[in-house]
A protein has these predicted regions:
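Transmembrane beta-strands of outer-membrane beta-barrel pores
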Residues: 364-366, 385, 396-400, 412-416, ...
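Outer-membrane beta-barrel initiation region
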Residues: 5-56, 60-63, 239, 296-416, ...
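C-terminal outer-membrane beta-barrel translocator/porin domains of Gram-negative envelope proteins
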Residues: 423, 428, 434-436, 447-449, ...
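A flexible loop/linker signature enriched in serine peptidases of the S9 family
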Residues: 1, 5-18, 44-45, 62-71, ...
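Outer-membrane beta-barrel "beta-signal"
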Residues: 521, 625, 676-680, 706-717
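Short loop/turn segments that connect beta-strands within beta-propeller blades
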Residues: 75-79, 124-128, 165-169, 209-213, ...
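Short coil/turn segments that connect the beta-strands within blades of beta-propeller domains
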Residues: 55-56, 99, 146-147, 190-192, ...
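Transmembrane beta-strand segments that form the barrel wall of outer-membrane beta-barrel proteins
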Residues: 135-136, 260-263, 349-373, 377-400, ...
Length: 717
């Protein structure tokens, strides 16, 4: 905003108001194409890339706030539509031939989140099942002809190649010019040739491609062209030559270009359909499917290097350098090297890059992953390297109960396997001591403890996350292992002496050994469908995991085995969500009392009834279930200027139940809680729509104790 005020003398709101007044002064134009699909209010809808299905139907890709992208079949006579199948995130326009649809989807690699490819996909209309073509993960703009299948293949070095496959014959690979990008591919049945849409230093242009190279048909111009298709000796595409998006065609026989539509706000994605043209036309509710006769509005187009300046109001010139007039030559590069020495970027020394700090001590990893924000007086340093494969934080905090606290966390993603390092110092040393109930005195007796030292711990874990994106579904297999050491004081079980009545006779003199090792292994699998803009959670999905934890340095410590399962189901009304979860954990081996109870054991904190902590349970045949029903109650879609935007307020009603065997193995203990959560989805300080944070207020009534209240913040990182 400050740049706008400085250069034009007005604020951005005034600029937008002036722009709106200018647009209102322009002559109004009507849409030349007739509407096939009406758009609903308050559900922004986008139809893309319509294709003819005979004389009575249209196939199009549809997305709206309520549902993710899917192919729909539209009746051209009534406008009624039927879903064919859901898709992943489509990367380039689909094409149709002989009952088979071809398109490409973005798919991330199995190991690296930053590596995203474009997967070749197809679907037979007879069964409506999307399929992927193995080994074709860098494909764009697929086109099938009666005899061949062609697509554009890109390489990481910036080179594009047109690949043509005919049956079992060797593939033909047609090269494109160096330093050029391919933005479209089409095949014309009349001229029996392939055509490409090229972008290079001269602008955008259309050419015919064969084994000898690319032969220009139009001249390069700084005019955006898009969605190239061909049929009956004509090329169809979108162009902004007239000053806004309209459908154009190029007659290959007459060598003339025509604009074939007029529209109020723009027409897109023209597709020939037996003498007619299918399009999408824009208005405030989205993009709707329209059609018109192919020759109903043939407006000749005069070749030009620039589009008509239609929608841009007159502006005064800013006193800045026009980059189009700047020339950077080899001599300039040599002079720059003399002034600024080129240095190699060394990865290891640059893993740490402290970029900001905060005047409070907290764990940002726990805040993002678990929505747990534990604040203390102090400060936090945040680090992220330039390659974004290493994140770290260091904090110093203080509170009255624990004194000084120092924490360190590092995450590294650069090798596919994720490594986590954490270290802590400060607070009170943990004791794993013994206790027993003396029936004669009616009191509990506990092991004597020495004065505690400062607590410290260090841990290292490795996780291999494998992603398997299959369009509408995303599956993940995760294998992990971790080690942790702390200076916890563990009861010395070798010194136990048993007396009469099954009581420990020397409980005050058993003593402790210093140090607690924890080694864990885990595996998990999840499968979830894509979420729409208004979905609270995936409509369908599940997660299964199991973990095994043991102490390799102390055989008296019991091993812990745990299982966890979670499922997402649709609610009774659209965008309502049901979440069901269950877990089981128990201790194995280790030292056991004569009654069979294991006094030294680990506990999993997963799925403990809300209002309780891990201190309230025992890992002795522990079983728990949880049920949550979540629904939106209000969508304000407003807020305070550029400070906060409240997107949605939702309500969750939940209940938890757990049971486990008490110390004697013959008594079942049962705990439960019921309550709800009020969740506010908001965007702070002009964050993009995808970066939505949450604020949650929780209130639950546990079966033991008073009401339990909690508040948490979820960050979108």
């Amino acid at each position: 905003m400050s740049v706008t005020v400085k250069m034009s003398g007005t604020r951005s709101r005034g600029t937008f108001d002036e722009l709106e007044r200018y647009w209102d002064s322009l002559p109004a134009e009507e849409d030349s194409a007739a509407t096939l699909t009406e758009l609903p209010e308050k559900n922004y809808t986008t139809y893309q890339w319509p294709l003819p299905l005979g004389d009575t139907a249209v196939l199009a890709l549809k997305t709206d706030f309520d549902r993710v992208s899917r192919f729909v079949r539209i009746d051209r006579r009534t406008g009624e539509e039927r879903r064919v199948c859901y898709t992943g995130q489509v990367s380039t326009r689909p094409s149709l031939n002989g009952g088979r649809v071809w398109w490409t989807e973005y798919r991330r690699s199995k190991l690296f989140e930053q590596r995203v490819n474009s997967q070749l996909c197809y679907m037979d209309l007879s069964d409506g099942v999307p399929r992927s073509v193995a080994g074709r993960r860098r494909a764009l703009f697929p086109v099938e002809t009666p005899d061949e299948l062609g697509w554009v293949e890109y390489n990481p070095d910036g080179r594009y190649t047109v690949v043509v496959r005919r049956g079992s014959e060797p593939e033909r690979r047609l090269s494109t010019p160096d330093r050029a990008e391919v933005h479209g591919l089409a095949w014309d049945d009349l001229t029996v040739a392939w055509y490409v849409l090229i972008t290079d230093d001269s602008g955008m242009w259309i050419g015919r491609i064969d084994s000898e190279g690319v032969h220009p048909i139009t001249e390069g111009a700084y005019i955006t062209l898009s969605n190239l298709r061909a049929a009956d000796g004509k090329l169809y595409y979108g162009s902004i030559a007239s000053g806004k998006d309209e459908a154009h065609c190029y007659d290959l026989m007459a060598r003339r270009e025509y604009r074939i539509t007029t529209s109020a706000y723009g027409s897109f994605s023209p597709a020939p359909a037996d003498g007619r043209v299918l399009l999408t036309t824009y208005d405030r509710r989205g993009y709707r499917v329209t059609e018109q006769a192919a020759d109903s509005a043939l407006v000749p187009v005069t070749p030009s290097r620039l589009p008509v300046n239609l929608v841009n109001p007159p502006r005064k010139r800013w006193d800045v350098v026009n980059l189009d007039t700047v020339r950077f030559e080899a001599a300039d590069s040599r002079m720059q090297r003399d002034s600024f020495r080129t240095k190699r970027y060394r990865k290891v020394p640059n893993l740490v890059n402290v970029h900001s700090w905060m005047p409070l001590a907290f764990n940002p990893f726990a805040a993002v992953d678990e929505h747990v924000i534990d604040l203390n007086l102090g400060f936090t340093l945040l680090s992220q390297n330039l390659l974004s494969n290493t994140e770290a934080y260091a904090s110093y905090g203080w509170n009255r109960n624990e004194g000084s606290l120092v924490n360190l966390g590092v995450r590294y993603f650069g090798l596919g396997v994720r490594f986590d390092l954490d270290a802590s110092y400060g607070g009170n040393q943990l004791f794993y001591s013994l206790g027993q109930y003396n029936q004669q005195t009616g009191k509990y007796e506990y092991q004597s403890r020495p004065a505690p030292d400062k607590y410290y711990s260090v841990g290292l874990s490795a996780t291999l996350p494998l992603y398997f994106q299959q369009g509408y579904h995303t599956r993940q297999l995760s294998v992990s292992t971790g080690w942790n050491y702390s200076n916890g004081m563990v009861a010395n079980m070798r010194e136990i002496e048993w007396g009469q009545g099954g009581l420990i006779s020397n409980i005050q003199h058993i003593g402790f050994s210093r140090g607690l090792h924890k080694l864990s292994f885990g595996v998990g699998f999840s499968d979830q469908v894509r979420m729409s803009h208004r979905d609270i959670a995936p409509r369908w999905g599940y997660t299964l995991s199991t973990n095994y934890t043991f102490n390799p340095a102390n055989s008296h410590f019991s091993d812990l085995i745990s299982f966890y399962g979670q499922a997402y189901l649709p609610g009774f009304v659209r965008h309502n969500s049901v979440k069901v979860a269950a877990t089981y954990q128990t201790s194995l081996g280790g030292y056991k009392y004569p009654s069979g109870y294991s006094p030294l054991s680990y506990r999993s904190t997963r799925l403990i009834p809300r209002g309780f902590t891990s201190a309230d349970i025992l890992s002795n045949n522990y079983t728990a279930v949880s049920l949550d029903y979540q629904l939106p109650v209000w969508c304000p879609e407003g807020g305070i200027g550029s400070v906060v935007y409240i997107k949605r307020i939702r309500l969750n009603a939940g209940g938890d139940y757990a049971q486990f065997r008490d110390a004697g193995h013959d008594v079942w203990r049962r705990i439960w809680s019921v309550g709800g959560d009020l969740v506010v989805d908001f965007n702070a300080f002009r964050q993009p729509a995808s970066a939505t944070s949450t604020f949650k207020l929780s209130c639950y009534k546990p079966s033991k104790g008073s009401m339990w209240f909690a508040a948490s913040v979820g960050l979108p990182f």
